[in-house]
Amino acid sequence: MAKDIIKYIKNINRKPSVPRRLLEQFIAKGASTIPELSKGIGVSLPTTTNALNELMGQGLVREIGKKADSAGRIPMVYDLQPTAGYFVGVNPEMDCLALAASDFCGNLITEKQKVPYVYENTPESLAEMGKIINVFIDNLPIKREEILEVCVNVAERVRPLEGRAYNMFNFLEE
């Protein structure tokens, strides 16, 4: 399922599309009704409804209930589906790693701070980071296959006069 979601998201990200703009709107504004979404992205109600149904069919968006404070016809409220996929973030520091996992809505599932690790520009250090990340993933309350992305923040410095960036693990460039 995660591979299908990744493929779908990559496909809608190739060009500006209504489903993509709806996802951006949900990320920025949270739960919304169809009229709010339509106004937020500047397209008609039928176009918004079609794109929303497409996202729901992909399992990325869900109906969460009715808007309670509305007069007249009570509109349905939609939001991102938290279980559509998960993300893992890794932030290496010189003497440790910080790792976190979040759901599709950005809600933190778990995090580990100050995991002992020596950040060096060596293949061994990179392999050790991979092992730590794999252990972290194995201990998550979700299946590995449900993880959409693992992002590692790799520090770098830039020499503006040369227009060159130097980062850790530059032995991979050789």
Positions of PLM-derived features:
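Glycine-rich phosphate-binding loop and adjoining helix at the ATP-binding site
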Residues: Y117-E174
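Extreme N-terminal segment that seeds HTH/winged-HTH DNA-binding domains in transcriptional regulators
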Residues: M1-K39
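Short, Lys/Arg-rich nucleic-acid/phosphate-binding segment
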Residues: I64-M76
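Gly/Thr-rich phosphate-binding beta-strand-loop-beta motif of the actin/hexokinase/Hsp70
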Residues: I74-E111
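N-terminal helix-turn-helix
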Residues: A31-E63
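Short glycine/proline-centered loop/turn elements that form peptide/ligand docking sites
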Residues: N11-P16, K29-S32, T47-N50, E54, ...
